[in-house]
Structures are given as structure tokens and as C-alpha cells.
Amino acid sequence: MRILLVEDDRKVGAFLEEGLRQEGFLVDWAHDGDEAVELAGAAAYDIILLDFMLPKRNGLHVAAEIRRLGQETPILMLTARDSADDVRRGRAAGVNDYMGKPFKFDDLLDRIHALVRQE
């Protein structure tokens, strides 16, 4: 399974990338919103793990742009911002699901598998 990880925090990104690779996933890591849109448009992914707060474009703008590109890849937003308004705006931008930070890695794996199975 190929994952696009979009995370600007180097420590969080490195932790997630290493854990996902150990689970057998192929991981491409984008460090900002522009890089995320570029990678999403250039390759096929099974799921996109998308941080909300990013340099250059926030996660909502990234999700909306990915959808404008015609990508139907499931998007899981990883964020501490999970108010009802944030969730509503995310859904409107094309986000499939939210996961609040902090989270347990095993819970992330469960959510990844559930979203990919739905597709």
C-alpha cells in the first residue's frame, strides 16, 4: 500500500514514516502543502495522511486542490483542530475522515485500513 504522508513537523513525520515503513507501507513524505499537491498529482496513492497546519497551504486547501485534480484517494486529516466547524469545512474540502492528535499508532493503522477498505 502506498501512502502520501503530509506533515511539516520533522519529529512527527519521521516517527510516522518509520512506523509506517516497518508495517510494510511505501511512504512518500511531503513537508508542505505545495509539495503535497505536486506529489498527489504525480503518483497514485492508496491513502493520504494530511496534517491540518502546514506551511504554504493548510490542509483544507491541499485537500480541495487534490480533489480539483480529480483524485479520489481517501484523505485522513491528522490534527489537533477537530471542532465541529473544522470537520464541516474539511468534509466540504474533500477530507474523508479526521483523527485527533495525539493518537495511538495502532489506532492510526486501524483507521488507514478501514478507509482503504471503503474505497
Model-derived regions, located:
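C-terminal output helix
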Residues: 103-113
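Short hydrophobic/Thr-rich beta-strand motif most characteristic of the beta2 strand and flanking loop
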Residues: 24-31, 39
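The feature encodes the CheY-like receiver
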Residues: 55, 83, 101-102
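Short amphipathic alpha-helix used as the core "switch/output" element in two-component signaling
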Residues: 60-71
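Acidic catalytic/metal-coordinating carboxylates
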Residues: 32, 58-61
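Conserved acidic carboxylate
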Residues: 7
